[in-house]
Every structure is written in C-alpha cells, then in structure tokens.
Amino acid sequence: MKHFVVIANAYKDRDFALTNKIVAYIEQKGGTAKGLMSNVEAISDNEFELEDIPQDTQCILVLGGDGTLIRAATRVETLEIPLMGVNLGTLGYLCEVEEATVFDAIDSLMADKYMTEDRIMLIGHKRGSETSRVALNDIVIHRKGNLQILSLNVYVNGEFLNNYHADGIIVATPTGSTGYSMSAGGPIVDPKGDMILLTPNNAHNLTSKSIVLSGDDEIEIEILSRREQNDELACVSYDGDTTAELAVGDRFVISRAANHTKICKLHQRSFLEILRKKMGNYS
C-alpha cells in the first residue's frame, strides 16, 4: 500500500509534530499521506469529515490510543478502510505500534507485509426512530441524574430474557470485552469472535451474570418505571459518548452492524500473548 491518511489525537500529538514526520516519511518513500485531526470529544467542530479522506486511501494510521482509534473507526466505518493504531497513551489493546516503532511499521505496510483482522461493530436505535449509530466497543444504557437504579426488561430476538434492577446494561463486542464490560465483571473474549456480550452494571441481585450471545442476535432493552411519577430517565452511550435519552416505555434495539472494522496487524501475536502483556503492566 502507498496511500495513507494519518489521524492524530489533537491532545497527544500537539502541533502535529509526529504527524508531519510520518507524512514526510511516507512521501519520501514514494507514497501519499494526508494528516487529519481527531479531538477527545467524539462530536466537535474541528473533527475530520469523511469528505476529507481521499478515495484512494488504503490505510488510516491513527495516532493516540484506543479511544482515538475507536472514534476514528466508527466515523469511517462505511469506508471499510483498514486502520492501524499508534499508541501514544498508556494501556492500548487495539494499538499494536508504539511511537518508537512507527516508521518500521510504515515500511512493513508499504511492503505489503501485514494482515487484517475483522472486528464486529454494534448498531443501536430507539424503537420507532430512524436515527441509528454504530459502536466498536459497546453500547451502554445507564441511569441519568439521581442516584437511583433502573428497571430494565431485556429481550433477545423478541423473547423475554430477564428483568434487571441495575445502574445499567452494557452490550459489548468482543473488542469491547476488555473495556467497560470487563470492569463490570464481564468475560474477556477473543476480539475476532462473532458474539455479543450482555453485562448488567451493578445489578441489585446476587445472581445476575453476564451472558454471551450470538453475533446474529438482536437485543431489545425496555425502560420500566419504579416510581409513581414515571419520571425515570436513562441515557444511551456509544463507546462512552452519551448521545440520547430514554424515558419510561422506550425500547432500544441493538444488533451487529453491517460493516466491520478492519485492523492492520504486523505480527501474528496471539490474543493471549497480548492480554498477558497488557494486563501484566497493571497487575
């Protein structure tokens, strides 16, 4: 591959210092590259647009950390261009390359010495609404405002699964299994898997456990009332970005998205090897 876009976290590559070095390096080797900015906020006036990405782009290099890569992946998901993360942060499961090895990585990419992994994404929408959004890690239904738990009915493919009294419900992809889902007690699974993880967050029940569902399943979450006023409100967060509110009686539908995120890999390291290395740093 010869045609690249470099998306940089504006707070981790200030003044585009590393981005400019990468663009110059690629051009020196006969390729093309364009630098774009990504902000910490998922919605920002300064965030890049799809129109900014040239049609001949073969790879997107994302400078920052897992969060930056996730934001970029969901923003460009319709293009299905492979991404490679360059870790400028701390703990990065998605970012295989570090700043010290980025130019060696570019050499490998330009010599076509790489593989790609397909990662499933989720798509969610409120029942009755035509507005939907995708997530690479997770979609979370969680309480808003007062410190009170939610009452949630969960259905899978139209069949009632369970009622949860909890702070919320985390619906995660295999990629997201090492994120918020793990913190709430969910299982860690191979990120290449085709499954959906359902994990109650702080459930008011001694027996509530995570459930691993098929990637083909459709999950529907209904907001119930626990108060006479029927004034409970819940929020929907996609990969940590809160974008919508749900009221009593609303139903929210989550399923596997049509498109995948393609991650460039340079080494055939097993998921367990990566897990040992990353988790070992924080044990």
From Swiss-Prot:
Places the protein is found: Cytoplasm
Entry keywords, A to Z: ATP-binding, Cytoplasm, Kinase, NAD, NADP, Nucleotide-binding, Transferase
InterPro entries registered for this protein in UniProt: ATP-NAD_kinase_N (IPR017438), ATP-NAD_kinase_PpnK-typ_C (IPR017437), NAD/diacylglycerol_kinase_sf (IPR016064), NADK (IPR002504)
GO biological process, one term: NAD metabolic process
Active-site residue numbers: 66
Molecular-function GO term, any one: ATP binding
Protein name per the record: NAD kinase
Keyword NAD: yes
Gene3D superfamilies the record matches: Probable inorganic polyphosphate/atp-NAD kinase, domain 1, Probable inorganic polyphosphate/atp-NAD kinase, domain 2
Principal place of residence: cytoplasm
GO CC, one annotated term: cytoplasm
Pfam family, one: NAD_kinase
Cofactor: a divalent metal cation
Enzyme class, spelled out: transferase
Reaction(s) catalysed by this chain's protein: NAD(+) + ATP = ADP + NADP(+) + H(+)
Its biological purpose: Involved in the regulation of the intracellular balance of NAD and NADP, and is a key enzyme in the biosynthesis of NADP. Catalyzes specifically the phosphorylation on 2'-hydroxyl of the adenosine moiety of NAD to yield NADP.
UniProt EC number: 2.7.1.23
Membership in a protein family: Belongs to the NAD kinase family.
Gene source species: Agathobacter rectalis (strain ATCC 33656 / DSM 3377 / JCM 17463 / KCTC 5835 / VPI 0990) (Eubacterium rectale)
Binding, NAD(+): 66-67, 71, 137-138, 165, 167, 178-183
